[in-house]
């Protein structure tokens, strides 16, 4: 049905003679649901800060700009779409207008280009119910993640644990290198704290008294 729906959209654009002047963007806001499918070789699923929860496909068709069949390896994030579409539409940013993302137009024109961005950030200071290997009752507990180059750091706010992964060598995030790479942990954590301060991102000020990492989610019965 997804293929049919995308085809219907493109057919309508062709019928209205708008297909040569329309940008089509296809993406997901999160990874696949673990109970329905497998995200292998990625770890985790929808609602988690592991790659299985935040890495998803992105396909862009921009007639006359993007090269059909080209592949770009530059990591991007959802907040990049707003500045991208502003630039594509020729909309000038207001003076002093601060945006979280960056325009992807350079990448759409040249898939081999790179963005001048030091890090990508994810911030989730809340609980999401559901079983995981790390927690029996929560798919996600309050946490944040940062990616700088091939390195990724995850901070769990409840217990302060830090997990470090090299995504180039360990895309499945099986080997936590935090103990072996303390200087890299320090570097990424400092960048994370700096971003958090600049954006005034909310962080839990105290632990949830009802939080129990050993708790197990009990399935609800049907009425």
List the model feature ranges, each with a label:
Residues 31-38, 44-49, 66-70, 74, ...:
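C-terminal cap/loop subdomain of S1 sulfatases and analogous C-terminal strand-loop tails that border
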Residues 10-13, 17, 31, 63, ...:
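A generic secondary-structure signal for well-formed alpha-helical elements
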Residues 18-24, 115-117, 149-151, 184:
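Loop/turn elements at helix/coil->beta-strand transitions in domains of secreted/extracellular proteins
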Residues 20-21, 93-96, 202-206:
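Surface-exposed patches in mature extracellular/periplasmic domains of secreted proteins
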């Amino acid at each position: 049905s997804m293929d049919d729906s995308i085809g219907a959209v493109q057919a309508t654009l062709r019928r209205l003679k708008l297909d040569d002047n329309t940008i089509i963007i296809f993406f997901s806001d999160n990874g696949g649901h673990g109970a329905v499918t497998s995200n292998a070789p990625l770890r985790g699923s929808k609602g988690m800060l592991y790659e299985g929860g935040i890495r998803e496909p992105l396909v862009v068709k921009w007639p006359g700009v993007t090269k059909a069949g080209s592949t770009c390896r530059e990591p991007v994030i959802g907040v990049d779409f707003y500045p991208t579409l502003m630039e594509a539409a020729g909309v000038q940013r207001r003076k002093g207008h601060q945006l979280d993302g960056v325009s992807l137009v350079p990448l759409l024109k040249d898939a081999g280009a790179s963005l001048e961005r030091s890090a990508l950030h994810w911030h989730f200071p809340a609980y999401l119910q559901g079983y995981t290997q790390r927690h029996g009752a929560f798919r996600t507990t309050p946490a944040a993640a940062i990616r700088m180059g091939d390195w990724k750091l995850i901070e769990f706010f409840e217990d302060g644990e830090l997990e470090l992964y090299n995504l180039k060598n360990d895309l499945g995030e099986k080997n936590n290198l935090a103990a072996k790479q303390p200087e890299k942990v320090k570097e990424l954590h400092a960048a994370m704290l700096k971003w958090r301060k600049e954006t005034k991102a909310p962080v839990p000020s105290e632990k949830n008294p009802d939080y129990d990492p050993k708790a197990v989610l009990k399935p609800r019965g049907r009425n």
